[in-house]
Structure formats: C-alpha cells, structure tokens
Amino acid sequence: MRSMEGSVPKYPEPTEGSIGASGAKRSWPEVVGMSAEKAKEIILRDKPDAQIEVIPVDAMVPLDFNPNRIFILVAVARTPTVG
C-alpha cells in the first residue's frame, strides 16, 4: 500500500468567490496559500458573523450544515521545534 504521508488531499476549487442566492459570499479562493490568521481576517471582513474553525487539512469535519461555520484547512509545512 502506498504511503499518503506528505500528500495533501485535493478539494474541488470554488468558482471566483461563489455567491449564494442571498447575494452573500460563500467561498474565498483568494485566501488559498495564506496563513490561517490572514485568511480568517479576510473572511471576517466579508462575513463578520462567521464562526471560523481552523483545523488540519486531513481532519474529519462535522457533517451537519451550519450556515455561519467556515472551516480553514491548514497543513503544517515544517516540523514544529522548541526554541
């Protein structure tokens, strides 16, 4: 069996900051590659009532739909070290 270590799952890319029926923005493709903190700042500008959760890219996410919840998926790029 092939090792999946170091691989990042591919998620479908939303189209140009998808806009929902209400006219509210529903996705933020422009934050891909940014730090979680910067992405959160940008998302909160567009959706101040968002409940943002920063989670590892390979984590299980709840399947219940919450229109105010936004997941920011992150991958650790280097080994964390003390000092």
Curated annotation (Swiss-Prot):
Alphabetical GO biological process terms: response to wounding
Keyword Membrane among UniProt keywords: no
Domain of life: Eukaryota
Chain positions of site Reactive bond for chymotrypsin and subtilisin: 63-64
Coiled-coil stretches noted in the UniProt entry, renumbered to this chain: none
PROSITE patterns: POTATO_INHIBITOR
Keyword NAD: no
Pfam families (alphabetical): potato_inhibit
Residues under site feature: Reactive bond for subtilisin: 34-35
GO MF assignments: serine-type endopeptidase inhibitor activity
UniProt keyword terms in alphabetical order: Protease inhibitor, Serine protease inhibitor
Function: Inhibits both subtilisin and chymotrypsin.
Protein family (similarity comment): Belongs to the protease inhibitor I13 (potato type I serine protease inhibitor) family.
PANTHER family assigned to the protein according to its UniProt record, in alphabetical order: PROTEIN, PUTATIVE, EXPRESSED-RELATED, SUBTILISIN-CHYMOTRYPSIN INHIBITOR-2A
Name this polypeptide is given: Subtilisin-chymotrypsin inhibitor CI-1B
Species: Hordeum vulgare
